[in-house]
Curated annotation (Swiss-Prot):
The lineage of its organism: Bacteria, Pseudomonadati, Pseudomonadota, Gammaproteobacteria, Enterobacterales. Its EC number is 2.7.1.39. It is found in: Cytoplasm. Belongs to the GHMP kinase family. Homoserine kinase subfamily. Its main location: cytoplasm. PROSITE patterns: GHMP_KINASES_ATP. One of its GO terms (biological process) is threonine biosynthetic process. It is an enzyme of class 2 (transferase). This is Homoserine kinase. GO terms for molecular function: ATP binding; homoserine kinase activity. It comes from Buchnera aphidicola subsp. Cinara cedri (strain Cc).
Length: 315
C-alpha cells in the first residue's frame, strides 16, 4: 500500500493574488492536510474517511479523486483498477487549499503506484489541470506549495511553472477557519474584470518590494508590503467578521492579517509564540461560527507532500 500526505496551503499570501502560495503545518503536529492510500483491487473503489468526508459528493463521479484517477489513466496511458482511500482532514471551501491537498496526494500516489515516473513538471501540470476543474481555471498557487513545500512563486512558464522563494522561518502563522464554507468560484466571480492602472501599479510595487525584502532579509519591510488590494476589498462582504478580527489581532501584536486564499479562513503572521497564543485564543472565542471551526498556530511546511507511515507518522 502507498500512503501520501499533502499539507494545507495559503493561496495569495496577501500580496500575490494567484501567483504566491505557501505550505503550512501546525506546530502541535496536527495533520492539517489530506491523506491518500492506494492499493491493488479487482475493481475501482473509492472510500472516504476523515472529519470532513461528509462534505464530499455522494456521487463517486463528482469526487475529484475519481476525476484524478480517470485523468491520470489518460495521461499515463495506463489503466489499473485500484482501491483509493481518501482521509479528508481539510474542510471544503475553507481557503486552505482543500481540493489541492486531495489532488496532490492522489496524483503523487498514482504516479508511485503506476511506476510511471513522470517528472515534477508533468505532475504539476496534471495537478493544475485538476484544480481548474473545481475552480473554473487552471491555477497553481495551492497545488505548487502543497506539492513542493515552502513559499512558491507561480511563473506559469510551461518549462518551469514555479520557483521557491526564501521566507522568514521565525514567523508564526495563525490560521482560523470559522466553520463555514465559501465557494472558490463565488469568491472569484465577485472580483472585477478590470482594475484601474493606479491599482495595478500599486500592487506591482507591493509585490516587488515584498519579494525584494525576502531576499534581502528585511522582515519589517516585507510585512509593510504584504497587502492585498486586489481581492480583499471585494471579498470582505463575504466574510462578515474579517475586518473586526483583523483590527483586533493586530492590536494584540500580530504583524499582519489577510484572507487565506478565497476565504473564509484568515491568517495572521506573529513575531513570537506569546503573541501567537493570544491571537489564537481571541480568534477561537470570536471568529468561530460553530464547533467545527478551528484555529492553529503554524510554521512553514518546507517539505510539501510526502509518504506516511502506517501510524500516521510523516516521513
Amino acid at each position: 500500500m502507498i500512503k501520501i500526505y499533502a499539507p494545507a496551503s495559503i493561496g495569495n499570501v496577501g500580496v500575490g493574488f494567484d501567483i504566491l502560495g505557501i505550505a503550512i503545518k501546525p506546530i502541535d503536529k496536527t495533520l492539517l492536510g489530506d491523506c491518500i492510500s492506494i492499493k491493488p483491487s479487482k475493481k475501482f473503489q473509492l472510500k472516504n474517511h476523515g472529519n470532513f468526508s461528509k462534505q464530499l459528493p455522494v456521487n463517486i463521479k463528482e469526487n475529484i479523486i475519481w476525476k484524478a484517477w480517470k485523468y491520470f489513466n489518460k495521461k499515463a496511458k495506463k489503466k489499473k483498477t485500484v482501491k483509493i482511500v481518501l482521509e479528508k482532514n481539510m474542510p471544503i471551501g475553507s481557503g486552505l487549499g482543500s481540493s489541492a491537498s486531495s489532488i496532490v496526494a492522489c496524483v503523487i500516489a498514482l504516479n508511485k503506484f503506476y511506476k510511471t515516473k513522470l517528472s515534477k513538471t508533468k505532475l504539476l501540470k496534471i495537478m493544475g489541470k485538476l484544480e481548474g476543474i473545481i475552480s473554473g481555471e487552471v491555477h497553481y498557487d495551492n497545488v505548487a506549495p502543497c506539492y513542493l513545500g515552502g513559499l512558491q512563486l507561480i511563473t506559469n512558464d510551461q518549462k518551469n511553472i514555479t520557483q521557491k522563494l526564501p521566507i522568514f522561518t521565525d514567523w508564526l502563522w495563525v490560521i482560523a477557519w470559522p466553520g463555514v464554507t465559501l465557494s472558490t468560484s463565488q469568491a472569484r466571480n465577485i472580483l472585477p474584470l478590470k482594475y484601474k492602472k493606479k491599482t495595478c501599479i500599486h500592487n506591482s510595487r507591493n509585490l516587488a518590494t515584498f519579494i525584494h525584502a525576502l531576499y534581502t532579509k528585511q522582515s519589517e519591510l516585507a510585512i509593510r508590503y504584504m497587502k492585498d488590494i486586489i481581492a480583499e476589498p471585494y471579498r470582505i462582504p463575504l466574510i462578515p467578521k474579517f475586518l473586526i478580527s483583523k483590527k483586533k489581532i493586530i492590536e494584540l501584536g500580530a504583524l499582519t492579517c489577510n484572507i487565506s486564499g478565497s476565504g473564509p479562513t484568515l491568517f495572521s503572521v506573529c513575531p513570537n509564540i506569546s503573541i501567537a497564543k493570544k491571537v489564537k485564543i481571541w480568534l477561537k472565542k470570536n471568529y468561530m461560527e460553530n464547533q467545527t471551526g478551528f484555529v492553529h498556530i503554524c510554521k512553514i511546511d518546507q517539505s510539501g507532500a510526502r509518504k506516511m507511515e502506517k501510524k500516521n507518522e510523516i516521513i
